[in-house]
Swiss-Prot record:
Residues 41-52 have a biased composition (Low complexity). Residues 35-74 are annotated as: Disordered. It comes from Oryza sativa subsp. japonica (Rice). CDD domains: ADP_Glucose_PP (cd02508), LbH_G1P_AT_C (cd04651). It comes from the Eukaryota. Activated by 3'phosphoglycerate, inhibited by orthophosphate. Allosteric regulation. Inhibited by inorganic phosphate (Pi). Disruption phenotype: Shrunken seed endosperm due to a strong reduction in starch synthesis. GO terms for biological process: glycogen biosynthetic process; starch biosynthetic process; starch metabolic process. Its EC number is 2.7.7.27. This is Glucose-1-phosphate adenylyltransferase small subunit 2, chloroplastic/amyloplastic/cytosolic. The gene is AGPS2.
Length: 514
């Protein structure tokens, strides 16, 4: 069972980095004696002239090229905890994830039985020794704020580093009466706060991606290539490449061209030699494209220059600021990430990512990695109780009560209550925010009400059941008519990509058939 790892949220990564500090001293000397750094934001000479007729490998690393094991130490000088500010972008209204975003911000959507989406980038930061983190949002931020304050509190990383995880909601002022207009605009509106921090770089992250990444190696590559901006890049085959914004690089790994979801000849023109970024020859032939992950390291003074001086009206990093920086001659470098990554922007992607953690023998994404745990709110719930149930290929969260039912290839969230005779297949149950007492259930029964959870003899297949849903007895949620798209909000559910999603706090009377 996936148990919360947040009981001592600061200690695992803080102790590890403290223990590694001695072994890093010799490497710090090598970094200190590297090539002289040019002023940030000043355009460097062209890559052709710098190459001088020879090909130079950039200092860019991927998980395949450089091991993430403890034997491969990453040594930043100065340390990431004091020199890097993490900025997580909460995204827009989350219309593609609706109705999961009806009552919550997108980063607050539950994930993997015990967690929320925001726990992924925050945990990646903490495991990478980045302990100063802001989360920017403007829609339904109450539950996100509550989760972050309970999960991470203050003094993340210890009193020495004075770490924090803080939500910054969009606000109107006499100087700026507008809400966030995009990713770059969101950062611009809070530049006055970010520039007060004595850091070298800003790490820009998305709040709706599922992946595990060592940001210290990302930042190390940024510093060692003397870049103004470094963009995390994902290798792609031709089939997937048409759905992403692609980048073209020169022989040093420097980004020279962008194309948004290209097709045909334009797609062919974006092919690159991915061995430059660390892929072996076989993988490079399979993956001849690189896509932007929407993750950036941007030097502090470069960020200030770009958002205030060069592109004061730009709203988006990916389509405006980053290509613009390339056009004015800044050094924009690619950093290859060759691991599992999923943009959880749609109901279908969210559904597949959750069920992917049940995959055998190795899940798409594992919550059981001791070297880089995923932290979350400590809830102090009892162990789950399973009574005469048949549970296969599933993940069960904390505090569940499961009685004489069948569960297969499903994810069952916190405090889920599943009654006798129920069949749950290929589904995601998000659970509940609270327990109902036996007295509450008795009173509900006397009034003809339905308790939170899954009633007796229900059959649920290929569905998402949001929190606190009340599903009566003998309900079938199996998409009997194979409907692909339907908006039945007044009835308590939506269907997107053939997946039935029951809305948070919805009530489905006994005998309902969907």
């Amino acid at each position: 069972m996936a148990m919360a790892a947040a009981m001592g949220v600061a200690s695992p990564y803080h102790a590890a980095h403290a223990a590694a500090s001695t072994s890093c001293d010799s490497l710090r000397l090598l970094v200190a004696e590297g090539r002289p750094r040019r002023p940030r934001g000043v355009a460097s000479s062209s890559s052709s002239s710098s190459s001088a007729g020879r090909r130079r490998r950039p200092l860019v690393f991927s998980p395949r090229a450089v091991s993430d094991s403890k034997s491969s130490q990453t040594c930043l000088d100065p340390d990431a905890s004091t020199s890097v500010l993490g900025i997580i972008l909460g995204g827009g209204a989350g219309t593609r994830l609706y109705p999961l975003t009806k009552k919550r911000a997108k980063p607050a959507v539950p994930l993997g039985a015990n967690y929320r989406l925001i726990d992924i980038p925050v945990s990646n930061c903490l495991n990478s020794n980045i302990s100063k983190i802001y989360v920017l949002t403007q829609f339904n931020s109450a539950s996100l704020n509550r989760h972050l304050s309970r999960a991470y509190g203050n003094n993340i990383g210890g009193y020495k580093n004075e770490g924090f995880v803080e939500v910054l909601a969009a606000q109107q002022s006499p100087d700026n009466p507008n809400w966030f207009q995009g990713t770059a605009d969101a950062v611009r509106q809070y530049l006055w706060l970010f520039e007060e921090h004595n850091v070298m770089e800003f790490l820009i992250l998305a709040g709706d991606h599922l992946y595990r990444m060592d940001y210290e190696k990302f930042i190390q590559a940024h510093r060692e290539t003397d870049s103004d901006i470094t963009v995390a890049a994902l290798p792609m085959d031709e089939k997937r490449a048409t759905a992403f914004g692609l980048m073209k690089i020169d022989e040093e790994g420097r980004i020279v061209e962008f194309a948004e979801k290209p097709k045909g000849e334009q797609l062919k023109a974006m092919m690159v030699d991915t061995t430059i970024l660390g892929l072996d020859d076989v993988r490079a032939k399979e993956m001849p494209y690189i896509a932007s992950m929407g993750i950036y390291v941007i030097s502090k003074n470069v960020m200030l220059q770009l958002l205030r001086e060069q592109f004061p009206g730009a709203n988006d990093f990916g389509s405006e600021v980053i290509p613009g920086a390339t056009n004015i001659g800044m050094r924009v470098q690619a950093y290859l990430y060759d691991g599992y990554w999923e943009d959880i922007g749609t109901i279908e992607a969210f559904y597949n990512a959750n069920l992917g953690i049940t995959k055998k023998p190795v899940p798409d994404f594992s919550f059981y990695d001791r070297s880089a745990p995923i932290y979350t709110q400590p809830r102090h719930l009892p162990p789950s109780k399973v009574l005469d149930a048949d549970v296969t290929d599933s993940v069960i969260g904390e505090g569940c009560v499961i009685k004489n039912c069948k569960i297969h290839h499903s994810v069952v969230g916190l405090r889920s209550c599943i009654s006798e005779g129920a069949i749950i297949e290929d589904s995601l149950l998000m659970g509940a925010d609270y327990y109902e007492t036996e007295a509450d259930k008795k009173l509900l029964g006397e009034k003809g009400g339905i308790p939170i959870g899954i009633g007796k003899n229900c059959h649920i297949r290929r569905a998402i059941i949001d929190k606190n849903a009340r599903i009566g007895d003998n309900v079938k949620i199996i998409n009997v008519d194979n409907v692909q798209e339907a908006a039945r909000e007044t009835d308590g559910y939506f269907i997107k990509s053939g997946i039935v999603t029951v809305i948070k706090d919805a009530l489905l009377p006994s005998g309902t058939v969907i």
